[in-house]
């Protein structure tokens, strides 16, 4: 696999090898069985790069994010190897890093607390309002947005608020799970450009999306998922060269 990154390091920030995820289920006769939804999945993210994970709905993209962060439901079983900066990504390490070094930007703005003003949400426990003002300014959010509730934000503003939470935490790994639903083409591209900026600042970005055309605009590498596994991982430019540059 190509070691493409913007920080000049040969070590991946995130490494996922041979990941398998299954869920315990019960049939109509109450017999327990395991439903495997991800198998033999591989992906790496280096500092300073955007890796776009593309695939149709049901291909396992969001489950990859939840596996890395350790937020799968209790009936899930995870096998394989996951590492963060060379350390095995154990449950204990996931809890330590989640929301700090590793941040999820969810697909739905409903993750914002509807009863709390957004400035306070972005500030979190360790931040300051001065830093909130600075981050909001970076993403073109008006000062009055601090005092707004989520329902008062436009779709584009809400997306920028979610991105602001990652910047406030100075996260090293940002996992963006379908961050552009419901946005027009221009607003979607603007939203994704913020992830490109974060990668250029040294973050590793795992961008989960179904829109490969948008991914081309910012990604260093594309990982194609199909049927719960990785079928292709290559530089974004290889897709434009034609099928002779691809394995599949």
What kind of feature is each model-predicted range?
Residues 88-103, 239-242:
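ABC ATPase NBD coupling module
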Residues 209-210:
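H-loop/switch region of ABC-family ATPase nucleotide-binding domains
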Residues 108, 114-127:
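Q-loop/switch helix immediately C-terminal to the Walker
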Residues 77-88:
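Conserved ABC transporter NBD signature motif
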Residues 215-217:
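A short, surface-exposed alpha-helical micro-motif characterized by mixed small hydrophobic
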Residues 149-153, 157:
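Conserved ABC ATPase signature
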